[in-house]
């Protein structure tokens, strides 16, 4: 199955251009390997699944950003991330869902990693749990799953989770990737979907409609994506018009 992902580069305030990338995706299998339910010292609980070693390792990493369009995950793209992780620990973040990435990332790609842990962060209180921020900071690769970017912005922005992700990108310099909603929040400019998803027809008819909610340089900070806004699921539904509006 082929899926399109577009990235728009903004040279504010005048020049806008886009580049089209086409990937061929292969559907991964999802298998639950291990469930962990954590309680930290402040009595906040959160859900996490982990596969692999329980001992943290530190490896030599190379920074990079992996943007995925929200279709079936691309094996080569994730292999590229893990090759930059040097066999370290992988953390997957999401605000809902399951551990569907764990076994796929740990044992089905042929690139060794020490562990893969999926963490559900579905409230601002959980985004402030010190143990979660520490797990993120200790990662050698980070992947932000698809879902609803409005929840990522609402729950994670201006919290220790945001600080930890930016630490990985800019200080520790590890590979960071995202698909769908996880891709949407990686640009310096990002569509937050705070007022529900806007269609191309709605956005083109009124660029100032309440559904056109754009964040600017106030969340995640990647030098690779300065002056960039992303959008995903380009063919279903058609999102060319709304990204032009963005």
Regions found by a protein language model. Give the residues of each.
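Bacterial Sec-dependent N-terminal signal peptides
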Residues: 1-45
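Polar helix-capping/helix-linker motif
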Residues: 24, 128-129, 158-159
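Beta-sheet entry/capping signal
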Residues: 33, 89, 142, 173-176, ...
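Short glycine-rich loop/turn motifs that provide flexible caps or phosphate-binding loops at active sites
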Residues: 37, 68, 145-146, 177-181
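Extended, subdomain-level signal for the structured scaffold at the beginning of enzyme domains
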Residues: 44-151
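Class I SAM-dependent methyltransferase SAM-binding "motif I" and its flanking Rossmann-like core
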Residues: 154-241
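Short, intrinsically disordered, charge-balanced linker/junction segments flanking boundaries
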Residues: 243-246
């Amino acid at each position: 199955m082929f899926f399109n992902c577009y990235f728009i580069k903004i040279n504010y305030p005048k020049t806008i251009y886009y580049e089209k990338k086409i990937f061929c995706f292969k559907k991964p299998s999802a298998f639950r390997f291990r469930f962990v339910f954590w309680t930290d010292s402040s009595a906040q609980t959160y859900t996490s699944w982990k596969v692999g070693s329980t001992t943290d390792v530190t490896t030599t990493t190379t920074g990079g950003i992996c943007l995925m369009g929200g279709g079936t995950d691309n094996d080569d793209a994730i292999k590229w991330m893990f090759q930059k992780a040097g066999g370290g620990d992988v953390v997957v973040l999401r605000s809902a869902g399951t551990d569907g990435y764990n076994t796929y990332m740990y044992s089905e790609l042929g690139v060794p990693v020490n562990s893969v842990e999926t963490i559900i962060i579905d409230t601002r209180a959980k985004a402030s749990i010190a143990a979660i921020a520490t797990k993120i900071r200790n990662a050698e690769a980070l992947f932000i799953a698809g879902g609803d970017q409005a929840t990522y912005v609402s729950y994670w922005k201006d919290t220790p989770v945001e600080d930890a992700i930016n630490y990985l990108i800019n200080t520790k310099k590890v590979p960071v990737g995202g698909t769908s909603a996880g891709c949407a929040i990686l640009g310096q400019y990002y569509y937050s979907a705070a007022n529900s998803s806007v269609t191309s027809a709605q956005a083109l008819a009124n660029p100032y409609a309440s559904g056109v909610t754009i964040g600017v340089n106030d969340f995640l900070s990647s030098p690779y994506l300065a002056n960039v806004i992303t959008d995903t699921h380009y063919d279903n539904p058609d999102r060319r018009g709304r990204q032009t509006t963005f």
